[in-house]
Curated annotation (Swiss-Prot):
InterPro entries: Aromatic_Lyase, Fumarase/histidase_N, L-Aspartase-like, Phe/His_NH3-lyase_AS, Phe_NH3-lyase, Phe_NH3-lyase_shielding_dom_sf. The modification 2,3-didehydroalanine (Ser) is found at residue 199. The keyword Ribosomal protein does not apply. GO terms for biological process: cinnamic acid biosynthetic process; L-phenylalanine catabolic process. This is Phenylalanine ammonia-lyase. Keywords: Cytoplasm, Lyase, Phenylalanine catabolism, Phenylpropanoid metabolism. One of its GO terms (molecular function) is phenylalanine ammonia-lyase activity. It catalyses: L-phenylalanine = (E)-cinnamate + NH4(+). Belongs to the PAL/histidase family. It is found in: Cytoplasm. It is an enzyme of class 4 (lyase). (E)-cinnamate binds at residues 257, 345, 351, 381, 453, 481, 484.
Length: 713
C-alpha cells in the first residue's frame, strides 16, 4: 500500500495501527508481554529521566508522573516533526472558515445549542472560555477546592501530547507556551471539581485557556509557590513575547475539549499503584518469614495449574524472597517438632496471598495500558482530517476508559489493602502469630506495653475507608448540559477517588512495614532470649541434677536434654517477662519433665541420694536465682548492639527493605519503656513512601530474580 499523508505525518498503512491488526487487539495484547516487575522497572527508569520528548504517540504514565512530581527537574521537549501536522490542521480551519464551511464549534454554538450560528469565530472561542470558567475555588485555610499542582502539570503535558498529533486545529505556538509554563514550573490554578469528563474536562481545562488568553480571573502558582496573574506568568515564562493569545476559530475548543485532566491524574495514580502492588507482594513474603510460615504455598505447580499470569508472578516473586531465607530454614526445624499438634497449613491471608494479589495486579496492568492509550489518543471534537479535507464530528472526548479503568483500579487497591489488614491482624494477635507477643509489644513488662494496639485500630479505620472508596463512581452519571451530555464518564472524579484510595493504601503500607520490622526485631530478641534460657537451664541442670551429694553421677542427669526440648517448644514471649513464675508455662513444663523422670526412676526414688524428686526443689531454687538476671543480661546485650546471635534478616533477600526502614529512615524497635510512639515511626515511613524513596530498596529485594519461578523438582 502506498504511503499516505495524515495531517503532515506519513503512515505506511493508512489509518490501520498494524496491517493485520485493524481493530488493535493484537497491539493491546502485546503491550502486556513480559513480567509486571520488568514493567515497574521500566516505569521507574523513565520516571527518573531528565527529559520528556513529546511527539503525540509515545507518552507513558511514568513520564506523566515525573512531570507531575518532579517540577522543573524534568524538561519537556516538543518534536519539531510535529510542527507541520499541527500547522496543517490549524491552516485548514482558517481556510474552511474563510470559505464559509459550517463546522461545529467554529461557526456553531456548543453542545445542545449547536443550532446557533456565527461568523465571529474568534469571539466565539473567547465566549467558550468565559462560560466554562464556572469553577469554584473557595477561600480560607480550612479547605481547598483547587486541583493539586501535580495533577494540573500532568493535564498540561497530556493535552500538549494530544494536540501535537495535528487533528485539532490549534497553533504550534500555543503548545510551545504551555510547554514553557511547564519548564518554568508555572502552574495554572484549576478548580478541583466541576467536570464530568464527557465532552472532555471542559471546566478545568478552560482555566489553562484562561491563562493563555489573559483572562483577569486567571491565576497561576510560580516556582516558589507565589501567586501569579496572567501577565506575571507570561513574563516569568518568557512566553509569546509576553503577549496573550487571541484565540483563532477552533482553538478554544481544542484546548478544552479533551480528557487530559482525568487521564493525567489517572497516570499519576497508576504509577503509584504499580509500585504499591509490587510492594504488597514483597511484604507478603516478609509476613511469611516472620510468621514462621510454610513456603510450600509458593510452589510453582500450584500456580501453573491455575493459569493466571498475575498469580503465577506473585507466587514466583514470593518464592524468590523465601528461597534460602534463614527464617524459612529455622521454621522448617520448628515445624518438624510435634507436627501432629500443629495446623497443617497456614491461614488464607498468607497461604492464598498469590491468588489474592495476582488478579489485582492484572487489573492494574490492564488499566495502565488503557490509560497509556488514552494519553496518546486524539480526544477532542471535531477532528480535522486534512488528508480528506473534512471535519469529523464524533465523541472521542468521552472519557469512559478513564472512569472504567480507575473504578477497576480502585477495587484492586481496596483488595490489596484488605489483604494487608488481614495479615496485620494475624501479626499482632498472639493466638495466630506463632509466638510473637500480643500487639508486638517489645518491652519487659507487657502490662505496661500495648505495642501496636493503636496501630491496629488505625489500620481498621484505614481499611474501612478504603473499602468505601472501592465503590464505583461511573454508576452515578447524571444527564448534563440540556440532555446533550446525557451519558458521561466521570473520569476525573474516579481518578480523584483513586488517588485518595492510594493515599490510604500508603498509610496502611507504612504502618504494616513498621510492624513487620518490629516483628523481625522481636524474632531476633526471641532467639537471643531463648539461647540465654537454654544456657542457663543447662548450667543449672549440670550443677543441681548431674551429681549426687557425694559427687557420684545422679539419675537426674538424663533430664537435661528433655528440659532443653521444653525451651525449644515453648513460646519465649509466653513467659519471659517473669520466667520463673509458677503460673507461666516454662516452669510448669520443666517441673513436669522432672516429675516424669522421677516416676520412671523406680526404686531409686526411695534412696535420698538417688531421688530425682528431692532434686527438684534445688533445681528450681537455683533457676529462680539466676534465670531472671541472665534473661535481662541477654536483653541488655542486644540493646547495646552485642547480641549473642545476629539478626537473621541480614541473610535474607528482604533485608534491603528492613535496612531502609531501620537504618536509612532511623526508625526504632518500639517498647512501652520509650517515649517514641508507633505513629511517629509510621509517619517517617509514609513521608519517605510519598517521596518515592521506597522504590530502590524494594527493587533491590528482587535484584536476583530472573523473571521465572523456581523449577518444579
Amino acid at each position: 500500500m502506498a504511503a499516505v499523508v495524515e495531517n503532515g505525518h506519513h503512515g505506511n498503512n493508512g489509518f490501520c495501527v498494524k496491517q493485520n491488526d485493524p481493530l488493535n487487539w493484537v497491539a493491546a495484547a502485546e503491550e502486556l508481554k513480559g513480567s509486571h516487575l520488568d514493567e515497574v522497572k521500566r516505569m521507574v527508569e523513565e520516571f527518573r529521566k531528565t527529559v520528556v520528548k513529546l511527539g503525540g504517540e509515545t507518552l507513558t504514565i511514568s513520564q506523566v508522573a515525573a512531570i507531575a512530581a518532579r517540577d522543573n527537574e524534568v524538561a519537556v521537549q516538543l518534536a519539531e516533526s510535529s510542527r507541520a501536522g499541527v500547522k496543517a490542521s490549524s491552516d485548514w480551519v482558517m481556510e474552511s472558515m474563510n470559505k464559509g464551511t459550517d463546522s461545529y464549534g467554529v461557526t456553531t454554538g456548543f453542545g445542545a445549542t449547536s443550532h446557533r450560528r456565527t461568523k465571529q469565530g474568534g469571539a466565539l472561542q473567547k465566549e467558550l472560555i468565559r462560560f466554562l470558567n464556572a469553577g469554584i475555588f473557595g477561600n480560607g485555610t480550612e479547605s481547598t477546592h483547587t486541583l493539586p499542582h501535580s495533577a494540573t502539570r500532568a493535564a498540561m503535558l497530556v493535552r500538549i501530547n494530544t494536540l501535537l498529533q495535528g487533528y485539532s486545529g490549534i497553533r504550534f505556538e500555543i503548545l510551545e507556551t504551555i510547554t514553557k509554563f511547564l519548564n518554568h514550573n508555572i502552574t495554572p490554578c484549576l478548580p478541583l471539581r466541576g467536570t464530568i469528563t464527557a465532552s472532555g474536562d471542559l471546566v478545568p481545562l478552560s482555566y489553562i485557556a484562561g491563562l493563555l488568553t489573559g483572562r483577569p480571573n486567571s491565576k497561576a502558582v510560580g516556582p516558589n509557590g507565589e501567586s501569579l496573574n496572567a501577565e506575571q506568568a507570561f513574563k516569568l515564562a518568557g512566553a509569546n513575547s509576553g503577549l496573550f493569545f487571541e484565540l483563532q476559530p477552533k482553538e478554544g475548543l481544542a484546548l478544552v475539549n479533551g480528557t487530559a485532566v482525568g487521564s493525567g491524574l489517572a497516570s499519576i495514580a497508576l504509577y503509584e499503584a504499580n509500585i504499591l502492588s509490587l510492594l504488597a507482594e514483597v511484604m507478603s513474603a516478609v509476613f511469611a518469614e516472620v510468621m514462621n510460615g510454610k513456603p510450600e504455598f509458593t510452589d510453582h505447580l500450584t500456580h501453573k495449574l491455575k493459569h493466571h499470569p498475575g498469580q503465577i508472578e506473585a507466587a514466583a516473586i514470593m518464592e524468590h524472597i523465601l528461597d534460602g531465607s534463614s527464617y524459612v530454614k529455622a521454621a522448617q526445624k520448628m515445624h518438624e517438632m510435634d507436627p501432629l499438634q500443629k495446623p497443617k497449613q497456614d491461614r488464607y491471608a498468607l497461604r492464598t496471598s498469590p491468588q489474592w494479589l495476582g488478579p489485582q495486579i492484572e487489573v492494574i496492568r490492564t488499566a495502565t495500558k488503557m490509560i497509556e492509550r488514552e494519553i496518546n489518543s486524539v480526544n477532542d471534537n471535531p477532528l480535522i482530517d486534512v488528508s480528506r479535507n473534512k471535519a469529523l464530528h464524533g465523541g472521542n472526548f468521552q472519557g469512559t476508559p478513564i472512569g472504567v479503568s480507575m473504578d477497576n483500579s480502585r477495587l484492586a487497591i481496596a483488595s490489596i489493602g484488605k489483604l494487608m489488614f488481614a495479615q496485620f491482624s494475624e501479626l499482632v494477635n498472639d493466638f495466630y502469630n506463632n509466638g510473637l507477643p500480643s500487639n508486638l509489644s517489645g518491652g519487659r513488662n507487657p502490662s505496661l506495653d500495648y505495642g501496636f494496639k493503636g496501630s491496629e485500630i488505625a489500620m481498621a479505620s484505614y481499611c474501612s475507608e478504603l473499602q468505601f472508596l472501592a465503590n464505583p463512581v461511573t454508576n452515578h452519571v447524571q444527564s448534563a448540559e440540556q440532555h446533550n451530555q446525557d451519558v458521561n464518564s466521570l473520569g476525573l472524579i474516579s481518578s480523584r477517588k483513586t488517588v485518595e484510595a492510594l493515599d490510604i493504601l500508603k498509610l496502611m503500607s507504612s504502618t504494616y512495614l513498621v510492624a513487620l520490622c518490629q516483628a523481625i526485631d522481636l524474632r531476633h530478641l526471641e532467639e537471643n532470649l531463648r539461647l540465654s534460657v537454654k544456657n542457663t537451664i543447662s548450667q543449672v541442670a549440670k550443677r543441681t541434677l548431674t551429681t549426687g551429694v557425694n559427687g557420684e553421677l545422679h539419675p537426674s542427669r538424663f533430664c537435661e536434654l528433655d528440659l532443653l526440648r521444653v525451651v525449644d517448644r515453648e513460646y519465649v514471649f509466653a513467659y519471659v517477662d517473669d520466667p520463673c513464675s509458677a503460673t507461666y508455662p516454662l516452669m510448669q513444663k520443666l517441673r513436669q519433665v522432672l516429675v516424669e523422670h522421677a516416676l520412671k526412676n523406680g526404686e531409686n526414688e526411695k534412696n535420698a541420694s538417688t531421688s530425682i524428686f528431692q532434686k527438684i526443689e534445688a533445681f528450681e531454687a537455683e533457676l529462680k536465682a539466676v534465670l531472671p538476671k541472665e534473661v535481662e543480661s541477654a536483653r541488655v546485650a542486644l540493646e547495646d548492639g552485642k547480641p549473642a546471635i545476629a539478626n537473621r534478616i541480614t541473610e535474607c533477600r528482604s533485608y534491603p527493605l528492613y535496612k531502609f526502614i531501620r537504618e536509612e529512615l532511623g526508625t526504632n524497635f518500639l517498647t512501652g519503656e520509650k517515649v517514641m510512639s508507633p505513629g511517629e515511626e509510621c509517619d517517617r515511613v509514609f513521608t519517605a513512601m510519598s517521596k518515592g524513596l521506597i522504590v530502590d530498596p524494594l527493587l533491590k529485594c528482587l535484584e536476583g530474580w530472573n523473571g521465572a519461578p523456581l523449577p518444579i523438582c
